[in-house]
């Protein structure tokens, strides 16, 4: 029976609605707990928030969540004083500081939720196929409120699976990283995926944003 290597679940956040972010972390944690594989995963809330009110609320909410779930030592919170290079820099800082402990990381968005069973499946895929560097899921939009969001959510439900199948066909063994809802092999990502600044002025030069 294959047991997945240790996996980090990382939530990079930036001045978000604190209660909503931590509720998604809570739901994800509890869903993973139900799989019986929680011991193979550790959670990180990686804050780049610039408002002192926000990051103090984040710290208080993190401590409260850990007490509720008895998750000290399994859910970690880090606030970065200088949010250099935005989200990409946030993830890079995690990889340099803590990445050596983990074989894989699942990168979430602040508004992401993923079922625990899906996380376990992703980790097992990486374990079974050591040449895979990244597995990108196909996220679905839920809970949209605005007209544009509702239209986007409908189109996502109506033909999202067909779009993903077509994308997989044309990409073959390669793949695009959308920046979230993906599992990544940490060592390979750290060694080969650092991107340089482009020469010239923005928007065609400077930092690579996406």
Regions from the PLM with identified roles:
Residues 1-210:
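Internal catalytic domains of large membrane-associated glycosyltransferases
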